[in-house]
């Protein structure tokens, strides 16, 4: 039986309206109170702003990601008291203050192995031997570090980095020397510790000087003209790269107790710039009585000039997928070493009547044995004070090199130069590090070209700068040499030469010699407190770590014999 409208109205509760009761029994100091938790979600009872056709067929996770409540009370991701918006809320969003820790898509590189043995450096003789620079076969070179890796599908410029992507070992590389099982690990030093070392040293003083230098040809400072590019010509001159303990001058200075630590500028700069290094290397340290000699092995990685060592996407080896044999690290290092050797010989004016002679003749050149004339090279043996306040004097003697001399345009005085060359292989190839086209940009955008080289070759340029400062050179000349054809590494052209004061260039690179002196003194002290013998300082091939090993008697003889044997095999071929 249907009820009448009057009966329904009569059944309604008494009061002014309908709904929940106005009063509540829960009060706090007379104020109505509703218990709550900050963890409770305060969402909307119903959302009428979205359409009914929601693309949500991804299961529970898809639903929670797309349609969960916008705010958790007390979470701090939005305003504490959210006032209702009078306008449409669909276009409103809150910027998240939570750091995004999502990993990137791309990987970190591949495996790197060393190439075949080749003819590269100075063979060990009684006086050290001279460098035989050959362009034939690829040299054995322990290198190939990629600080970035490659994009699988991004192509050129497609690199992206994730959280702590910089801190991962990029490639599995071979060490520059085989660590034997009977070698004792004495110290392990992280690069972070090396970067905190500091020791102020003096400007140094000249102990003795040998050799001679020719005058620099200033015509190379002029920008090259496209129609008249200067070719890099191979010039055979007798150049030497004698290790420390085989240097007859250093042997005499050691007998006179001139210093405690002895080294060459190449070895010393490698140690002082160790925190910037990426490729593996090793230094042999000989401790005899109260003296320490920093030496290098024959055909060591220190003899080679690296290319784009610090580039984000460094050159790849064949084992890493590189099909460009002339752009692999070992081939590029051999090419760069060849360029530097010939570039220094070409940019000087060989005039016997105008050369600048040092106090003594070249200590390594023997006219009866050599068929080529000696290269323009002056050897200065300089002494530095590495003492601290709470001990006796500790001196270091280093053999430095100067390549040329020029007249100061203002006062006409002689300025000594160190001459080096940067080389461009192919700015569009893998491993170029985003380098600009030197032919079109070197004149108009010189600063950008140099800045890119500072980024891609930070370690190499730092070593050259340190060598110039150690030699007390007035100017560091950097040549820019490019391939005549990017697909061939046989012919090169000189595009220009730029000169800097070494200390100004060091400031641009944020290079501090006090840190380098601290590293040298620390490593020397580690060896001075130990027994006489041989030690090897090894740069880890995959980590930013230096390791100091104690080598038993005869432990390095086998390594040196193997190197000489390989050299003889190459000569026979």
Curated annotation (Swiss-Prot):
**What stretch or stretches form a coiled coil here?**
none
**Alphabetized InterPro entries for the sequence:** eIF3d
Q: What is this protein called?
A: Eukaryotic translation initiation factor 3 subunit D
Pfam families attached to this UniProt entry? eIF-3_zeta (PF05091)
GO BP annotations of the record are: cap-dependent translational initiation; formation of cytoplasmic translation initiation complex
**Source species, domain of life:** Eukaryota
The protein's job, in short, is: mRNA cap-binding component of the eukaryotic translation initiation factor 3 (eIF-3) complex, which is involved in protein synthesis of a specialized repertoire of mRNAs and, together with other initiation factors, stimulates binding of mRNA and methionyl-tRNAi to the 40S ribosome. The eIF-3 complex specifically targets and initiates translation of a subset of mRNAs involved in cell proliferation. In the eIF-3 complex, eif3d specifically recognizes and binds the 7-methylguanosine cap of a subset of mRNAs.
What's said on domains?
A: The RNA gate region regulates mRNA cap recognition to prevent promiscuous mRNA-binding before assembly of eif3d into the full eukaryotic translation initiation factor 3 (eIF-3) complex.
UniProt cross-references to PANTHER family, sorted A to Z: EUKARYOTIC TRANSLATION INITIATION FACTOR 3 SUBUNIT 7, EUKARYOTIC TRANSLATION INITIATION FACTOR 3 SUBUNIT D
Ranges for region Disordered? 111-162, 552-573
Query: Which cellular component terms (GO) are annotated to the entry?
Result: cytosol; eukaryotic 43S preinitiation complex; eukaryotic 48S preinitiation complex; eukaryotic translation initiation factor 3 complex, eIF3e; eukaryotic translation initiation factor 3 complex, eIF3m
Residue numbers spanned by region RNA gate: 301-315
Keyword list (alphabetical) reads:
Cytoplasm, Initiation factor, Protein biosynthesis, RNA-binding
Which family does the UniProt entry place this protein in?
Answer: Belongs to the eIF-3 subunit D family.
Q: Ranges of Acidic residues compositional bias? A: 556-573
Cell compartments where the protein resides: Cytoplasm
State the oligomer form and interacting partners: Component of the eukaryotic translation initiation factor 3 (eIF-3) complex.
Here the segments flagged for biased composition (Gly residues) are 136-156
Its main localization is cytoplasm
The GO molecular function terms of this record are: mRNA cap binding; translation initiation factor activity
């Amino acid at each position: 039986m249907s009820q009448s409208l009057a009966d329904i109205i009569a059944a309604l509760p008494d009061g002014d309206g309908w709904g929940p009761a106005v009063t509540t029994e829960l009060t706090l100091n007379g104020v109505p109170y509703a218990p709550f938790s900050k963890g409770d979600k305060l969402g909307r009872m119903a959302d009428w702003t979205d359409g009914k056709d929601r693309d949500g067929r991804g299961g529970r996770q898809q639903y929670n990601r797309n349609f969960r409540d916008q705010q958790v009370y007390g979470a701090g991701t939005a305003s504490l008291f959210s006032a209702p918006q009078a306008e449409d809320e669909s276009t409103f969003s809150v910027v998240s203050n939570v750091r995004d820790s999502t990993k990137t898509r791309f990987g970190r590189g591949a495996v790197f192995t060393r190439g075949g043995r080749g003819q590269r450096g100075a063979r060990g003789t009684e006086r050290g031997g001279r460098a035989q620079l050959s362009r034939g076969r690829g040299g054995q070179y322990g290198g190939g570090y990629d600080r970035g890796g490659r994009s699988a599908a991004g192509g050129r410029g497609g690199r992206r980095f994730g959280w702590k992507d910089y801190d991962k070992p990029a490639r599995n590389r071979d060490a520059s020397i085989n660590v034997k099982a009977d070698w004792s690990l004495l110290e392990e030093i992280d690069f972070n510790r090396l970067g905190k070392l500091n020791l102020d040293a003096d400007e140094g003083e000249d102990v003795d000087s040998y050799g001679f230098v020719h005058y620099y040809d200033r015509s190379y400072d002029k920008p090259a003209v496209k129609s008249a590019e200067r070719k890099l010509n191979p010039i055979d001159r007798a150049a030497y790269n004698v290790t420390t303990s085989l240097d007859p001058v250093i042997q005499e200075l050691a007998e006179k107790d001139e210093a405690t630590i002895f080294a060459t500028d190449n070895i010393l700069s490698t140690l002082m710039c160790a925190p910037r290094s990426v490729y593996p290397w090793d230094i042999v340290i000989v401790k005899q009585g109260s003296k320490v000699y920093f030496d290098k092995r024959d055909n060591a990685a220190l003899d080679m000039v690296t290319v784009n060592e610090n580039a984000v996407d460094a050159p790849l080896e064949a084992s890493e997928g590189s099909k460009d044999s002339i752009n692999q690290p070992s081939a590029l290092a051999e090419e760069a070493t060849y360029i530097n050797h010939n570039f220094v010989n070409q940019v000087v004016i060989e005039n016997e009547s105008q050369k600048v002679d040092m106090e003594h003749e070249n200590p390594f050149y023997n006219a009866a044995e050599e068929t080529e004339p000696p290269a323009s090279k002056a050897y200065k043996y300089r002494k530095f004070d590495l003492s601290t306040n709470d001990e006796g004097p500790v001196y270091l003697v280093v053999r430095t090199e100067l390549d040329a001399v020029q007249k100061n345009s203002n006062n006409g005085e002689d300025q000594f130069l160190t001459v080096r060359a940067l080389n461009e292989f192919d700015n569009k190839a893998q491993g170029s590090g985003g380098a600009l086209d030197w032919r079109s940009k070197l004149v108009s955008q010189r600063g950008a070209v140099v800045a890119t080289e500072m980024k891609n070759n930070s370690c190499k340029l730092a070593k050259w700068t340190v060598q110039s400062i150690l030699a007390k050179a007035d100017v560091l000349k950097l040549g820019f040499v490019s391939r005549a054809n990017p697909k061939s590494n046989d012919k090169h052209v000189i595009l220009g030469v730029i000169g800097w004061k070494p200390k100004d260039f060091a400031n641009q690179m944020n290079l501090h010699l006090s840190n380098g002196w601290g590293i040298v003194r620390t490593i020397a002290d580690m060896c001075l407190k130990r027994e006489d013998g041989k030690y090897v300082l090894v740069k880890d091939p995959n980590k930013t770590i230096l390791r100091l090993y104690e080598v038993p008697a005869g432990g390095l003889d086998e390594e040196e014999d193997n190197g000489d044997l390989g050299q003889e095999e190459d000569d026979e071929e």
